Each structure stands twice: as structure tokens, then as C-alpha cells.
UniProtKB/Swiss-Prot annotation:
GO MF entries: catalase activity; heme binding; metal ion binding
Residues bound to heme: 348
Family: Belongs to the catalase family.
Top-level taxon in the UniProt lineage: Eukaryota
Record-level GO BP terms: hydrogen peroxide catabolic process; response to hormone; response to hydrogen peroxide
Main location: cytoplasm
Record-linked Pfam families: Catalase (PF00199), Catalase-rel (PF06628)
Species in which this protein is naturally found: Triticum aestivum (Wheat)
Required co-factors: heme
Quaternary structure (record): Homotetramer.
Name of protein: Catalase
InterPro entries the record matches: Catalase, Catalase_AS, Catalase_clade1/3, Catalase_core, Catalase_haem_BS, Catalase_immune_responsive, Catalase_sf
UniProt keyword annotation of NADP present: no
């Protein structure tokens, strides 16, 4: 064994107890005292180390997506998309790539029930031959806001009050009464899909718009979609109360038990693509994260399948320390100018550095499985053994060179420096279309959830009227029904 390169694992456990530094421990039951009843001695280093380690076991929970469950498996390409992207892991049908997936609730804390009405996170880390690719999405295809400037305020509105530490509906409807762009997202959150049956029976979406780059440098805007082969199933409100009151971890248990029984969850991956030169041809902005791309004019294209066939070995190491960031991409898949995506590129990595430290990408679950090399040395909790003499670039001693240039197409950008909203807001059309796609019973459940939210004692008449106006612009009958239930006169 090379003593300088040994990485501790549970597979190398000794047959007896030791301290963290490896010294044998002959008594792990009793503290060192003066006599049988005397005071504990400070020299009992094993006791001090044991308590100190225990005091530091927990790390800051994620500011969002704190409650989560992970599983491992593989992604397999089933359809040729090599004409659209030069991404190596998508190079040909039959190619398999290891993955780890984390499902989560968004707003609520680490120990909260998995039956609360909340979006679900759906994050996939692909361990490719050209580095990791993190596809960090949700189970709903759109989002509440289109500009990341509003993200901290939005999360504050959803999170418990800083005064009472309780989540309060009046704060949510107050904040979003200023943001009609949220209406489309609320047609998902307040719909039946707002509470998935479990993680196996829910869709996944990349949500943001990315860019695919082909080998000849052609760019296509792209949306990613995961479809479960076992179908989408949801819990109605009363069912969620019953399930959540019985087991707070029902979705995690279902995922773990299904994999252990050999009933492996599977999703099909589809994409929608738009020629980057044609993005102005629609009545919506393809970079607007509050909009879906109509499948009748931009059809889904099959790409591959993902199978989760292995449970994680350790919750802390492979769930709490598992870190995702939309900035982590591979050649052939790039960002777009989606305002929310641009914000996430910074924020996700920044929050992981806060939770896990500057070297979080060295943790085994986050590290790439391919060979990699840079001069990002040292820092807190750097545990990679290095023996290089050259930690700078360029060098005539170290032969490390630049990689081949990506076929990124050139772009000409022009415009004034300004803070502004997009031209094509169109906040009401898609929300109304989705509401009208519901059957009458589903429409009524959606309406009742809004009545419940808007009859909170702290919700003012002004806020109620604004929401009636918004929903009236989506669908006149919905606005009238909401006004009638709230006993207020509609403005439209």
C-alpha cells in the first residue's frame, strides 16, 4: 500500500475500534475518570474526538431542495442525435453512461413530509468520458419567474416567515400578485400534479433552454424532457394528508424498495429543438422559462432511456454531499441566454461552496470519472494527493496542453446596457390553454385550491382582486367563478 495515496473506505475497516488517526481504542463504552465516580479527565482524547466529531456531523442544508432521495443507474442512447450535438455520450445508439439522480421537494426543510404541495426537483448527473454533465430540473416544465434577480425574494416568500417561522399563504399570493408571469407555473403547482404519487411516477424537465452544438458548429436551442415508463400518477389533497400522516418518507421508501426488489424505475429522454436562427418566429420567447414549447409545432424527439438500478450506499456521502450545477456541461451542450439559467450558472456552484467547501467537486460522488487535470490546487479539505512541481500554465516542463477547441459558432451581440423585461411577455395565453385542457372536476379542484389560498385572513381585498383579474385574462369563466367564490366583483 502506498501510504501517500491510500483513500480511506469502509472496505478497509479494521477489526477493532480506532481513533480517527488509527490508534487502537480498547474501551468505547466508558469515559476516563478519576476512580469509579470521579470527574472526567480532559486527557481522554478519544472521548473529546468522538464528541467533537458528533458536534460537526451536520452541514448546512440546501437553501432549497433540502429534502431529497438519490439513486444510481445508467443512461443509454436509443436514437441517433449526432446531427444535432457533438456531445460524446450521445454519439451513437447503444452508448451507456453512468448516472446518479437526486429527486427532491423544493421549499420545505430536510425533515418535511414528501406529500406537501411543492415542485419536485429532478437532477441528473451524467459521468461522461468528457467530464460530468448536470441536467438540473424539476417535475414541472416551467418556472415562476423569468429573471433570476427575483429568485431570493421568491424563495423568501415561499419559505417560513422570518417572524413566525411558519409558511403562510398570504406571503406567497402577495409576492406573486406582482408577477403575472407566474400564472403558467401555478397551473401546474395548484393542479393535481402539484403532489406526485412518488418519485417514480413523475415527469422531469430541464426547464431552462440550453443549446446543442453540432460538429460543424450549428446551434439549436433545446428543451429536455423525462417521461416515466410507468406513467404519471398524483395524490389528491385528502390522499396526501392520509399518506403524509402515515409516513413522512413515503416517496423515498417507494424508490428504495422498488430498486431493491428489482423493479427498476425508467424514464425516456426526449428533446425539443429550435434552429437558433428561427427563435423569433413564435408568439413567445423561447428563452422565457415561464413558457412551454408547443409540441404540435415543435415535436418531441426521442433520445434515450435512463434506468435506476442501484440504491446509494450512504445517504450523507451520496445525497447530502451530492452537488449539482447547471454550469457543469460537456462539449456539444452549452448554455443559452435564458435569464434564469444565466443566474443559476453562478448561484448553484456558489451555494455548494458554502455547504461543502471550495473543493466540493473532489468528493467522490461529484468528481468526474474520466481523467482530468488543472491547477486548481489547495484550499479547505483538498484531499487529492499531488506530486507535481509545476502548478502554473503555460510551462515548457509540463507537457499538459489545451484541449481541442469546441465547434462553438461565433455570435455577434449588440445592444444597450439596461435592466428591462423581455418583449414577448404573453403571460396569460398558455396558462389559460392549460386550464381549459382540464376536465370539469379537475378545473373545480384547481379553483378550490385558489379559493383556499385567497381566503387566508391576511389576504387583502386588493390582492384578491388582482388575482381575479389575472385569472380572468387567462380564462374568463375561471375569473368569474373565482370572483363568485370570493364574493367580490370582477374587474373584467
Amino acid at each position: 500500500m502506498d501510504p501517500y495515496k491510500h483513500r480511506p473506505t469502509s472496505g478497509a475497516n479494521s477489526a477493532y475500534w480506532t481513533t480517527n488517526s488509527g490508534a487502537p481504542v480498547w474501551n468505547n463504552n466508558n469515559a476516563l475518570t478519576v476512580g469509579h465516580r470521579g470527574p472526567i479527565l480532559l486527557e481522554d482524547y478519544h472521548l473529546i474526538e468522538k464528541l467533537a466529531q458528533f458536534d460537526r456531523e451536520r452541514i448546512p442544508e440546501r437553501v432549497v431542495h433540502a429534502r431529497g432521495a438519490s439513486a444510481k443507474g445508467f443512461f443509454e442512447v436509443t436514437h441517433d442525435v449526432s446531427q444535432l450535438t457533438c456531445a460524446d455520450f450521445l454519439r451513437a445508439p447503444g452508448v451507456q453512461t453512468p448516472v446518479i439522480v437526486r429527486f427532491s421537494t423544493v421549499v420545505h426543510e430536510r425533515g418535511s413530509p414528501e406529500t406537501l404541495r411543492d415542485p419536485r426537483g429532478f437532477a441528473v448527473k451524467f459521468y461522461t468520458r468528457e467530464g460530468n454533465f448536470d441536467l438540473v430540473g424539476n417535475n414541472m416544465p416551467v418556472f415562476f419567474i423569468r429573471d433570476g434577480m427575483k429568485f431570493p425574494d421568491m424563495v423568501h416568500a415561499f419559505k417560513p416567515s422570518s417572524k413566525t417561522n411558519m409558511q403562510e399563504n398570504w406571503r406567497v399570493v402577495d409576492f406573486f400578485s406582482h408577477h403575472p408571469e407566474s400564472l403558467h407555473m401555478f397551473t401546474f403547482l395548484f393542479d393535481d400534479v402539484g403532489i406526485p404519487l412518488n418519485y417514480r411516477h413523475m415527469d422531469g424537465f430541464g426547464v431552462n433552454t440550453y443549446t446543442l452544438i453540432s460538429r460543424d458548429g450549428k446551434a439549436h436551442l433545446v428543451k429536455f424532457h423525462w417521461k416515466p415508463t410507468c406513467g404519471v400518477k398524483c395524490l389528491l389533497d385528502d390522499e396526501a394528508v392520509t399518506v403524509g400522516g402515515t409516513c413522512h418518507t413515503h416517496a423515498t421508501k417507494d424508490l428504495t424498495d422498488s430498486i431493491a426488489a428489482g423493479n427498476y424505475p425508467e424514464w425516456k429522454l426526449f428533446i425539443q429543438t429550435i434552429d437558433a436562427d428561427h427563435e423569433d418566429r413564435f408568439d413567445f420567447d423561447p428563452l422565457d422559462v415561464t413558457k412551454t414549447w408547443p409540441e404540435d409545432i415543435i415535436p418531441l424527439q426521442p433520445v434515450g432511456r435512463m434506468v435506476l438500478n442501484k440504491n446509494i450506499d450512504n445517504f450523507f456521502a451520496e445525497n447530502e454531499q451530492l452537488a449539482f450545477c447547471p454550469a457543469v456541461t460537456v462539449p456539444g451542450i452549452h448554455y443559452s441566454d435564458d435569464k434564469l439559467l444565466q443566474t443559476r450558472i453562478f448561484s448553484y456552484a456558489d451555494t455548494q461552496r458554502h455547504r461543502l467547501g471550495p473543493n466540493y467537486l473532489m468528493l467522490p460522488v461529484n468528481a468526474p470519472k474520466c481523467a482530468h487535470h488543472n491547477n486548481h490546487h489547495d484550499g479547505l479539505m483538498n484531499f487529492i494527493h499531488r506530486d507535481e512541481e509545476v502548478n502554473y500554465f503555460p510551462s515548457r516542463v509540463d507537457p499538459t496542453r489545451h484541449a481541442e477547441k469546441d465547434p462553438m459558432p461565433p455570435r455577434v451581440l449588440s445592444g444597450c446596457r439596461e435592466k428591462c423585461i423581455i418583449d414577448k411577455e404573453n403571460n396569460f395565453k398558455q396558462a389559460g390553454e392549460r386550464y381549459r385542457s382540464f376536465d370539469p372536476a379537475r378545473q373545480d379542484r384547481f379553483l378550490q385550491r385558489w379559493v383556499d389560498a385567497l381566503t387566508d385572513a391576511r389576504v387583502t381585498h386588493e390582492i384578491q382582486s388582482i388575482w381575479v383579474s389575472y385569472w380572468s385574462q387567462c380564462d374568463a369563466s375561471l375569473g368569474q367563478k373565482l370572483a363568485s367564490r370570493l364574493k367580490i366583483k370582477p374587474n373584467m
